[in-house]
Amino acid sequence: VRPVAAPLQAKTITSAAHAMPHGASWADSFSCLFFQDGLPVTPDGQRAYEISSRRSDQRFRLRLGIDPVLATPWHRDRLANALATIGFGKRQGPWSEDGNHLVSLLLPIGVGIVFGGNHSMAAGIANGEGFVTSTDVQDLTPLYSHVRYDGLDFLRNHDGAQLSQPEDEEPGMLFEIGRLMVERGVAAGVEYVDPEPAAAPSMSGGDGYYKVLINGQDA
């Protein structure tokens, strides 16, 4: 997942540098990354957001230097200021998470989509420092029975209708990698945040390694 997501991550972070304000390449939602989630994807007309909804009852901890997180800074000057002043040894100090940072985690691929705090998040990603906790989680698994990516387009399975033709190939590749992960029982190596403070911390991905589970077992 990470090698495929890396070019997309670089594009979304840097596109503001050569675009007008609000003209950056957006990847801050399911619809921007894959296809409009309001489109019907089942024979009976169910829409993508109805069968793959965002849930806020689970939290995962993403490492900005390791886990693929897509930030979309939209203003060149704000991006330049964040990169110049946020980080270890810089004026604002090391990057740290705050309430402005909002990230939706896509499972099973373990990719975070930033929809709040994009400029400072871009600095954390560029510096490879800090952690961010997901705001909500969206599981793509229910979509795999109804949607596929054929290398060019996202298509509905039941009638072959085109849902979108993404500008970049990486979103489609990530979508299909997720299908393979589901078929083979491989989970993303992101750290689950236990809602019970007294509970033992999860070890699903630490600072020094990237844990992969196959059929529930550490590979």
PLM regions and their residue ranges:
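Long, compositionally biased intrinsically disordered regions
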Residues: 162-219
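Short active-site loop/helix that positions an aromatic residue
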Residues: 118-131
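Extended catalytic/binding region for NAD+/ADP-ribose chemistry, centered on the ART fold
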Residues: 111-118
